[in-house]
């Protein structure tokens, strides 16, 4: 790998890479993200390698193993360029057909194309699929185009040009001024203005200074940061380099969640390549700026995503938060000024420097600028990563991009912001997605988790789940969080078991406010949000559990009963065969019935009943 010592070297290198890429008439990209790996995309890639070698097409066709394009519901994903043909749910057996028909003859394979159920037609290009069409993909635009393990691919797309501009054409103060003017706010949850944070760190007394990338993404169902770091690690490194130059830091750390092996591997590969290319180390691009980066594996706890706990973890200590009266920008790693941003925040920096703050601030709303990546999961047809401009409505994300309800049940709510966020009812789906609007609704932006729930979801059970999760993840350092969440969990357990009484909801609310007001760190202060928002919008559901001893969503096992409709039952016997407690009785070809005293309420009978005769009440 060549050593880049100047902007001219960088430009010449890019020209050489682009010239080499010109020899390929066709490019095949195979998604190699964690989601598609669960669908055995590695085997699909190997099948392409074997088939291309067999057809002696290696010199004319480039095969790229890329990051996540976002449409995780449909993996493995394969795209053929320059035709821009998008194939989904590709299997190993499909590969020879793709090579012979699409690559060699330019023909589309119908059964691999996405089908728009509303329009009743096949769509060959990803950009015309509703899931992608309503998005504004700025940060994710290269995820499905580059091999994250090859710095050359990133350089070919203009990579490290923003770094060159910052180092050679701007002063540190000018970089900070540009970031402040862009209106970029931290994408990790707090929404603090990024430029102001950088300025505070630069002005803080003490040396050396540090920059940290937080990829300890612990929200259930969230994978935005993981996918960015897996798919385009050099964009994060470039952002960190620019930030370090602006702040005056010489050392950085990428803190990666322990459960993210591919993200850690690709980040380390990118760091090694950047060092060999002279883009990390001493005298970067001949500018006299020195900076290096190390990776650090997360401590495995959700609370390690909190800034002060993360700092402690990097230092080799137990990942416990400390009081917020001391900020990491003044006293962070080893007591020195430290600027900590999450993956998505760092990835925005090269875009802002390249395109300008005026361009960036033209996207979004008055107080929430740019785009935001969300992890759209739950009861929608299309799940995956979505990048949208700030200000888009929840309805547009859930129905236009997500495709609406998954199995015909009406959508009831969406939970945003992870365990610290809130549940927003369908009646508020016209709400714009920005920092202020979500906060006013009792939720938060958070890092970008978005869980869609339908009528089959019990909101009491949802509140109980998040309280239980946060109780387990609490460091236990402060009493309000440790004991308060434990007691809240006990109250919610009682309600779902039919043991709630007239005082349960009042006590639950009182405890929630105490935990929020008295806890030491952000985890405890925001932990009651799911409970408070569920009570605010779905109180009748809680009251039904307490007063009527019924679960309207038929989820809470102690409050439901299984029965068989005499009119609908065909007497096939499928239910009796799968019942683990032999609670189903009845003669063949005659209506069956369930013995309530034996029924374990496992739901197996309902799962196998083709006549839909099993009822839950």
Regions found by a protein language model. Give the residues of each.
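Iron-sulfur cluster-binding cysteine motifs and their immediate structural context
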Residues: 74-79, 480-486, 564, 574-593, ...
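Ferredoxin-type iron-sulfur electron-transfer modules in oxidoreductases and energy-metabolism complexes
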Residues: 2-26, 41-65, 82-111, 153, ...
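Accessory "access/gating" subregions that flank catalytic or transport cores
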Residues: 164-205, 361-362, 367, 375, ...
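Hydrophobic alpha-helical positions that pack around
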Residues: 134-135, 264-390, 402
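Conserved phosphate/anionic-ligand binding catalytic regions in large, soluble enzymes, centered on
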Residues: 33-37, 179-201, 300-312, 316, ...
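Flexible inter-domain linker/hinge segments
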Residues: 113-181, 335, 341-356
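Gly-rich Lys/Arg/Thr-decorated short loops/hinges at beta-loop-alpha junctions or inter-strand turns
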Residues: 30-32, 146-161, 213-225, 328-333, ...
């Amino acid at each position: 790998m060549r050593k880049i010592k100047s902007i001219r070297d960088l430009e010449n290198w890019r020209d050489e890479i682009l010239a080499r890429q010109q020899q390929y008439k066709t490019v095949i990209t195979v998604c190699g993200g964690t989601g598609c790996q669960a669908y055995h995309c590695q085997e699909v890639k190997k099948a392409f390698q074997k088939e291309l070698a067999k057809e002696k097409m290696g010199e004319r066709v480039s095969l790229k193993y890329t990051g996540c394009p976002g449409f995780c519901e449909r993996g493995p994903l394969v795209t053929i360029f320059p035709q821009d043909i998008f194939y989904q749910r590709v299997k190993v057996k499909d590969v020879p057909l793709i090579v012979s028909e699409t690559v060699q003859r330019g023909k589309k394979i119908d059964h691999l194309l996405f089908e728009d159920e509303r329009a009743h037609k096949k769509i060959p290009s990803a950009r015309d699929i509703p899931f992608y069409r309503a998005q504004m993909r700025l940060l994710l635009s290269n995820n499905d185009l580059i091999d994250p393990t090859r710095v050359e691919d990133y350089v070919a797309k203009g990579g490290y040009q923003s770094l060159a501009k910052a180092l050679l054409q701007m002063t540190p103060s000018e970089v900070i001024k540009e970031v402040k003017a862009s209106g970029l706010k931290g994408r990790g949850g707090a929404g603090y203005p990024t430029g102001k944070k950088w300025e505070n760190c630069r002005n803080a007394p003490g040396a050396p200074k540090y920059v940290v990338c937080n990829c300890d993404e612990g929200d259930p169902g969230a994978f935005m940061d993981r996918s960015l770091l897996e798919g385009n690690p050099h964009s994060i490194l470039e952002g960190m380099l620019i930030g370090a130059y602006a702040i005056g830091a010489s050392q950085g750390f990428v803190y990666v969640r322990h459960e993210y092996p591919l993200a850690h591997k690709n980040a380390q590969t990118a760091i090694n390549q950047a060092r060999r290319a002279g883009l990390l180390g001493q005298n970067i691009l001949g500018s006299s700026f020195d900076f290096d980066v190390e990776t650090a594996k997360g401590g495995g706890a959700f609370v390690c995503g909190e800034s002060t706990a993360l700092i402690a973890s990097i230092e080799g200590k137990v990942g416990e938060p400390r009081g917020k009266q001391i900020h990491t920008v003044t006293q962070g790693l080893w007591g020195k000024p430290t600027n900590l941003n999450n993956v998505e925040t760092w990835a925005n920096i090269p875009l802002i420097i390249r395109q300008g703050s005026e361009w960036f601030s033209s996207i979004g709303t008055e107080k929430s600028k740019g785009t935001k990546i969300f992890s759209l999961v739950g009861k929608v047809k299309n799940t995956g990563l979505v990048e949208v401009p700030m200000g888009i409505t929840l309805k547009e994300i859930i129905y236009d991009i997500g495709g609406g309800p998954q199995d015909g049940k009406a959508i009831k709510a969406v939970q945003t912001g992870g365990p610290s966020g809130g549940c927003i009812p369908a009646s508020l789906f016209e709400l714009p997605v920005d920092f202020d609007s979500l906060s006013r609704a009792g939720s938060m932006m958070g890092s970008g988790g978005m869980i869609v729930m339908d009528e089959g979801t019990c909101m009491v059970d949802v509140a109980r789940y998040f309280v239980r999760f946060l109780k387990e993840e609490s460091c236990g350092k402060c009493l309000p969080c440790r004991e308060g969440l434990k007691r809240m969990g006990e109250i919610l357990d009682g309600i779902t078991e039919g043991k709630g009484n007239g005082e349960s909801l009042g006590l639950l609310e009182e405890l929630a406010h105490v935990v929020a007001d008295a806890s030491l760190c952000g985890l405890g202060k925001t932990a009651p949000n799911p409970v408070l928002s569920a009570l605010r919008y779905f109180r009748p559901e809680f009251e039904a559990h307490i007063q009527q001893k019924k679960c309207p969503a038929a989820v809470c096992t102690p409050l439901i009963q299984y029965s068989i409709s005499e009119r609908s039952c065909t007497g096939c016997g499928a239910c009796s065969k799968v019942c683990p407690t032999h609670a189903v009785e009845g003669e063949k070809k005659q209506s069956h019935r369930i013995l309530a005293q034996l029924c374990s309420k496992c739901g197996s009978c309902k799962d196998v009943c083709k006549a839909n005769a099993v009822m839950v009440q």
